[in-house]
Structures are given as C-alpha cells and as structure tokens.
Amino acid sequence: MPFVGGAESGDPLGAGRPIGDDECEQYTSSVSLARMLYGGDLAEWVPRVHPKTTIERQQHGPVTFPNASAPTARCVTVVRAPMGSGKTTALIRWLREAIHSPDTSVLVVSCRRSFTQTLATRFAESGLVDFVTYFSSTNYIMNDRPFHRLIVQVESLHRVGPNLLNNYDVLVLDEVMSTLGQLYSPTMQQLGRVDALMLRLLRICPRIIAMDATANAQLVDFLCGLRGEKNVHVVVGEYAMPGFSARRCLFLPRLGTELLQAALRPPGPPSGPSPDASPEARGATFFGELEARLGGGDNICIFSSTVSFAEIVARFCRQFTDRVLLLHSLTPLGDVTTWGQYRVVIYTTVVTVGLSFDPLHFDGMFAYVKPMNYGPDMVSVYQSLGRVRTLRKGELLIYMDGSGARSEPVFTPMLLNHVVSSCGQWPAQFSQVTNLLCRRFKGRCDASACDTSLGRGSRIYNKFRYKHYFERCTLACLSDSLNILHMLLTLNCIRVRFWGHDDTLTPKDFCLFLRGVHFDALRAQRDLRELRCRDPEASLPAQAAETEEVGLFVEKYLRSDVAPAEIVALMRNLNSLMGRTRFIYLALLEACLRVPMATRSSAIFRRIYDHYATGVIPTINVTGELELVALPPTLNVTPVWELLCLCSTMAARLHWDSAAGGSGRTFGPDDVLDLLTPHYDRYMQLVFELGHCNVTDGLLLSEEAVKRVADALSGCPPRGSVSETDHAVALFKIIWGELFGVQMAKSTQTFPGAGRVKNLTKQTIVGLLDAHHIDHSACRTHRQLYALLMAHKREFAGARFKLRVPAWGRCLRTHSSSANPNADIILEAALSELPTEAWPMMQGAVNFSTL
C-alpha cells in the first residue's frame, strides 16, 4: 500500500474512495504514472488485465496492421507505435485491402484542420481518391454521397447526418488520443452531441482502427468495455525510423542570454564587458550551442513553445543568415515543402500533427520549452518536436525555462524521473511522498467527475478527464513537465541525457540540475523581457470610438465614462484566452454583486452567464488590428456558479468595487483564513477544476517529509514550514490571481479600514479594540478611544493586504457605477426574460425587497 502520512497525523487525505490494487498501481506510482498514461506499459498491462484481448509486439521494422480480409481479424484494432514508425503508411495499405467495393464507407476522424488536409492529400497521392473532407460540403449537414468516405475534424462530427453516421463500415481514429483530447478544447462547441455521436460510432461500427503514438491502457480498457475483450486486437510497435531512433536529446542547464544580448546589441562603443567566450561557458548554453552551429554553417530547425521567444531567437539567427523562416499563430503557415530553402526554420505548436518535413536538410534541432499554466502541454510539445523527420547529425538540444512554473509552496511536484529510478533509485521518502501526492490527485479528479453532471452524461469526456487534468495541472511544476517530456521522448526510442551527465543519473544529480535550471531561468527572465519584441505601436482610440462592435461591447460590459485609450488597453489584454477568461469571471462577479439573487438562484445566474459569457467581443491583436473573437462556451456552468457564489460573499465582506480599484478594506492573514474556512476544501477543488491548479492541502504540507521532497524537486532552496495561515494566504492569492486576474498586494495601512487613521470613526475604533480584546470601558470620547488605539499600535503591526484590480478591471460596470437606474438597461432586458418562478419567493410571492 502507498504511504498515507505520519503516524501522528493520521491519513492526510481524509475519508476517500478506496483505490483498488490495480488502479492503485496505475495511478499512484509517481515513477511510472507518465509511462502508463502514454502507453509505455501496454505490452505488460493488456495480458494481465484483459487476457482475452490479443496483443502483437512489432520490434524489427515499420508497423503493420492485421490482414483486413482475414476471417480471424477482430473488429477493433488499437495501434500504439512511436512517431516515425510508419503508422499512416500502414493505414493507407490497410484501407486499400479493406475497401472491397465502391459502396464501402469509411469515416476518418481527425484532431486538427491541418491534419485533415494533409491526410486527404496523402490519401489522394496513394490512390484513395474517393475521400473528401468536410471543407468541400456546401451544406451544413452531410448526409449522402460523396461523404460516405469522409475525413472530418472531431469538432464537426455533429455535421455528419444520421443516414451516413449509422452506416459507416470503417471508423478510423488517427491520432486518437489527441482527437479525444479535443473534447476538452475551448473550440468544442457541441460537446454533448459530439460525445454521444462518437460513442455510438465506437459501439456500432463494424471495423475500427484507433492509432496513436501515446495510445494507452485507458483507451484499450474503454474499447474492451464497449465491444468486449474478444473483439479487440492491440498492436504495440517498438520500432522507430532512424530519424528518431538515432536522435540524441540533450537537456541544457543554461539559456545564455549574455550571448543573445551581445549579438543583438546595436553597433557602437561597448557598454560593458564582453560575455565569457570560453568553450565551457558557451557549451552549456542554448545560445552558445546555437551560435556554434550557425557559425559552422549548419541548417537548424528551432521549436519554441512561446511566440515571444520565437521572435527573439529569429532576431538572433538573422545575425548569421538572412534565410530564416518564422512560423507561429500570427504568421501564414505556408507550404512545409519550402522549408528546404531556409537555413533556419523557427516554429511553435502551430506546426503539429499532420504537418511534417521529410527531406534530409536540417543538421540539428533546438527546442525552448516554457511550462505555463495555460500551455502548451508537454504532449503538444512532443508532437511538435517530431515534425522534422530526419536530422543529419541527429542532435536535439532542449532548454526548459522554469520561470513560467508556479513558485508558491502549495504547488508540489508529484512525479519522479524514471531514469533516476532505474539507475540510482529514489530514496524511499521521495517515492512515499510523491506516490501519496499522486493518490491525492486521483482523488481530486474523481471528485470532479462525481460533482459534474456533464461528466455523468458524457461517457468519453468523463473517461479521459484524468489525463486532461494531469497534462494541465503538471504544467505548474518544472520537474513534472520535464519528467513527462523525458518519458515521451524515451518512449519514442530517443536517447535522452542531461548536460554534464551520462546515461546514469542519481537523485542528487537530478535535483541539482533542476536547481541550476530554475535559477538560470529566473536570471534570464529580466533579459528576455528587455529584448522581447514589443507590440507595434498603433493609434487606435479613434477607431475604437467609431466602431459599432466596440460601442456595443462598452454598453454591455463597461462604465459609460471609460476613455477610448482605456478601451484600447483592455482590448489588447483580451487578445489572449487567459485575458478573456479572467475578464468574463470578473464581469460575472460584478454582476453577482449588482444582482445578489444570482447567488441564490441557478436560473438567474445562468441568464447572467449567458448574457456575459457568450457571443463575441472585440480584441486588438499583436499587429494592431481590431478583431472579433468568439467566447468559448464553458462546458459545465455549475462550478462557475459555485465559485461566483463563494467569491461574491468574500467580495462583499472586503467591500469590493472594481471601479474603485479593488477591496475597500484591508485584511490580514487571519482574516483570509476566516474568509476561506467555511468552504476551504471546495475552494481547492474549484481552483483545480476551473484554474487547473493542483494545490497540495495544508495537512500534507505540514509533514516534514513532504516539505523536504517538495524543496528538492522544486529546484528551490529549503523553505520553512507552511503554516495554516500561510497556506490560506497562498490559496486566496491563487483564487483571485489565477481566476480573476486580481493581485493581492501588501497594504501600508497599520489599521484595517479604507480611510486614514485620523479619520476613523468612534464606532470603527471600538470595533478594532473589541476585535483585539482591548478593554476600553474607561474611554468615553473619540479622543480617549483614539489614544488607547495608538497605545496598542504594536498589536496591529502584522502584515495587511489589499486586493488590487488590474488596470482594465477599473473599466467594468460595477454596483457603484450603476447607481443610475438606467445604467444597466441591457442586463435588465436579459433578466426580464426569466419567468417569475425563477426569482426567490417569500410566502408564495416574489420577495421584491431583495431584488
């Protein structure tokens, strides 16, 4: 059994659902959890758990599929094989065998538009000319020929009519794990329908091919449950083409921003000492290695997980060659076949599954990976690293930037590196603590599934929810992200090393490497900020003032007296998904404060939610252009309502007003604990579900063993113990900062309250004295009470805080800015559509006094 806490503390997890032995082994092993989730254990797991399912291991060549016409062929085939193992080629060969007549119908479900187009091109070039894509349909619903052989993106599955959907002979799920992962994407507008349609296809389709480099036990288990063990065949490919198996990956400890600054420094007299030119100093750095290869004439491809770093590294490369191609979400993707015309190609996750470059043109690859709460996740990074199929020198150099990971002590790494485990063995204390954290994470995911009505109604969505949370929540910790990427590369037959170490790695080596990377990222952060390409300057206030869509946006969300320049600044912030999400949550909070009954009636809140959180809003992109962006629907509104109910209560106690800058009164750590205590566990669960922040509970963090392991795996110097109030302050900060974009700042005020000390009223002073149990029975006048308060000034000397709204938050319509009865006509009109019974009742009648 896994470690469950110290003898004195009992079980820090509390009463929870017991985990069975097999499930415990799968989900609570911090060393092998990533291996399980990405299919590395299929060859051992299938015979043990589903003995009637046949399994075929292919080790010595490109993957092959079972004979489609063989009488013993099973109806479901799951293929797990690395990138570069020939899966798509084998699929095309299999389809040629399986399509016996012109009437044989095939549905191919993909995960991305680019993948759909690439697959259609490959099919056509291979003689499968009858396949069409959903792009060619002139009607919204596709219900007849030529769509009997269709390649469709999973988000558009609901556009396939019942005449076709119920009669497909073959279902192909290429990149099946990515396809199922799209169920959790903001672009999924019809989740319930798509989930139900996919489930129907998986149940009734005569032949199914599901293939992916990371197909895992969850997928096989799900298909065995739907179709029966005897009808499932699993192919495990353990071969990768030399373009991958001969590739050598090296994790670098330093970025080398001093070399970057020197290369980009404008001509003129030197402003300081030149960077260290020693081979040792340059060799351990990203930019030192890149400079050496570009100077030596190599052709290099570079992956960057952020657009801003892609822009910076492009500027660096242009110091060596003009033939630099930069590809990200803000540039045209172009034709991949033209990459051979460039010495350097730099790309982000915009180049992913479905797009690949096969010619032997590039000598090596560099990768800059910055784990951040809003992605990209490590699977997307891994897929993007495989877009260039061959490298002359087989070199892949990776720098992990830890500055985007969370530094708060309540975020605890829960994964252990698998190479360290096989070479030097992690100390028992490390494995006990991290196994416990994995178990706690599984329990939190299970609680999410139990609480969500949507999850109960959507079987596929619910089945793979754990993997979605795992990939998002682990982005908070540098070591977790590094371990996941390390495992994915290892499973793809790529040899991975850390700079300064051979294939063996001890726990001490790994923790020291993490610490070095962590501190280097913090040092490099300021340099990168100075060099970052700034948004182009554009004068947009006049255009914003004259645009109808902006006018409607202002009327709906903002105060009437907001200046055009403030509107422009807000629309720039709304260009990111994170900015839009926080804006909507803060707008909903203000609406709940203006209409308090929204916290007592789900129908009222739902109407307010539909009013503010749906439709389109104007944004300004990085090129300075006005752009309308659709707000993604929230898949389940219930936890959003619960969050707003709890936070509006907190906001009212803190005298919250966005227009006034945030909280109207200051508060101390004890006040924070008091605010959170009634619903502490629910706050942690809601932050997990809505913010993808896996906060370790305070009881666990009070364990000395947990604290030591967390310090070692976080790459940080030893930190003190986390007290109950410390934990509450950290959780409070995450709730407001991560979900609403609100910062918690230290206040300079000695005493609670919104005003200056000398302006405190007699009643306020009495309240302060009573709160600190200071006897004031001998004081009658304001002067006497004030003198007594000042005499006990030291008792109020603890840290005090205020919540500060971001600059754009001051533009929002609030309860104070809506004092005018006509100030919120649009919301009033929306609420007027609610039936009378939706409003709170008192003795059978609407309670008008509370409206």
Curated annotation (Swiss-Prot):
The molecular function terms of the Gene Ontology recorded here are: ATP binding; DNA replication origin binding
What does the annotation give as the result of altering residue 204 to T?
In strain: Nonneuroinvasive mutant HF10 and 17 syn+
| SMART domains xrefs | DEXDc
- Helicase ATP-binding domain boundaries: 68-233
The effect of residue 745 to T is: In strain: Nonneuroinvasive mutant HF10
| A Gene Ontology cellular-component term | host cell nucleus
Q: Which residues form the signal peptide?
A: none
GO BP terms: bidirectional double-stranded viral DNA replication; DNA replication
Which residues participate in ATP binding?
Answer: 81-88
Q: What is its main location?
A: host cell
Effect of substituting residue 818 to N: In strain: 17 syn+
One Pfam entry name: Herpes_ori_bp
Q: Which UniProt keywords apply?
A: ATP-binding, DNA replication, DNA-binding, Host nucleus, Nucleotide-binding
Q: Does the keyword Methyltransferase apply?
A: no
The record ties this protein, via InterPro entries, to:
Helicase_ATP-bd, P-loop_NTPase, Replication_origin-bd
The observed outcome of changing residue 797 to V is: In strain: Nonneuroinvasive mutant HF10
- Write out the annotated subcellular location: Host nucleus
What residue spans carry the region label Disordered? Answer: 1-21
Q: Which family does it belong to?
A: Belongs to the herpesviridae OriBP family.
Self-association and partners: Homodimer. Interacts with the major DNA-binding protein ICP8. Interacts with the helicase/primase component UL8 and the polymerase accessory protein UL42.
Function text: Functions as a docking protein to recruit essential components of the viral replication machinery to viral DNA origins. In the presence of the major DNA-binding protein, opens dsDNA leading to a conformational change in the origin that facilitates DNA unwinding and subsequent replication.
Q: What is this protein called?
A: Replication origin-binding protein
The organism named in the record is Human herpesvirus 1 (strain 17) (HHV-1)
